[in-house]
Amino acid sequence: MLAFDFFGATEGGLFDINATLPLMAIQVVALTYILNSLFFKPVGNVVEKREKFVSNNIMDAKNKLSEVEKLEADLLSQLQSARYEAQKIVSEAENESDKLYKEALALANDEANASKEKARLEIENQTSSARDQLFKQADDLSELIVNRLILEK
């Protein structure tokens, strides 16, 4: 037959109130302490170190990213400045070459005009000289004709 005790459980059941219960409680506390000191603390320390490592790496990455962005902005600024300076130099060189071209063209035109004027004056002198010779020859010829006509009479 089954005998029931005051709490409704049979003897030798799952929960007997005797020395086993405090012993089990002491074992649970001891096991918790041992697991905590041998397993959970080292694992917790490793996890904390890993979190610190990851956190530090993230902070370093953010700092490096901001530094890279700053350097990129500086380099872009320098690039724009260099492009502006290059355009300015090219523009100045074009202006200088245009100026030199115009000066050379003006000098060539002046030389051409001077040569043309010199040639015109030389042609006028030669024409005048040729005209004078023709007039002199015409005078000589007319004098010769007049002298022959006078001699024939």
Curated annotation (Swiss-Prot):
**What CDD domains does UniProt report for this protein, alphabetically?**
ATP-synt_Fo_b
Its Gene Ontology cellular component terms are: plasma membrane-derived thylakoid membrane; proton-transporting ATP synthase complex
How the protein sits in the membrane?
Single-pass membrane protein
TM ranges are: 23-40
SUPFAM superfamilies with a match to the protein in the record = F1F0 ATP synthase subunit B, membrane domain (SSF81573)
A Pfam family in this protein?
Answer: ATP-synt_B
Q: Which HAMAP family match?
A: ATP_synth_b_bprime, ATP_synth_bprime
Give the UniProt family note: Belongs to the ATPase B chain family.
What function does this protein fulfil? Answer: F(1)F(0) ATP synthase produces ATP from ADP in the presence of a proton or sodium gradient. F-type ATPases consist of two structural domains, F(1) containing the extramembraneous catalytic core and F(0) containing the membrane proton channel, linked together by a central stalk and a peripheral stalk. During catalysis, ATP synthesis in the catalytic domain of F(1) is coupled via a rotary mechanism of the central stalk subunits to proton translocation. Component of the F(0) channel, it forms part of the peripheral stalk, linking F(1) to F(0). The b'-subunit is a diverged and duplicated form of b found in plants and photosynthetic bacteria.
Description of how the protein assembles with itself and partners: F-type ATPases have 2 components, F(1) - the catalytic core - and F(0) - the membrane proton channel. F(1) has five subunits: alpha(3), beta(3), gamma(1), delta(1), epsilon(1). F(0) has four main subunits: a(1), b(1), b'(1) and c(10-14). The alpha and beta chains form an alternating ring which encloses part of the gamma chain. F(1) is attached to F(0) by a central stalk formed by the gamma and epsilon chains, while a peripheral stalk is formed by the delta, b and b' chains.
Protein name per UniProt: ATP synthase subunit b'
The organism of origin for this protein:
Prochlorococcus marinus subsp. pastoris (strain CCMP1986 / NIES-2087 / MED4)
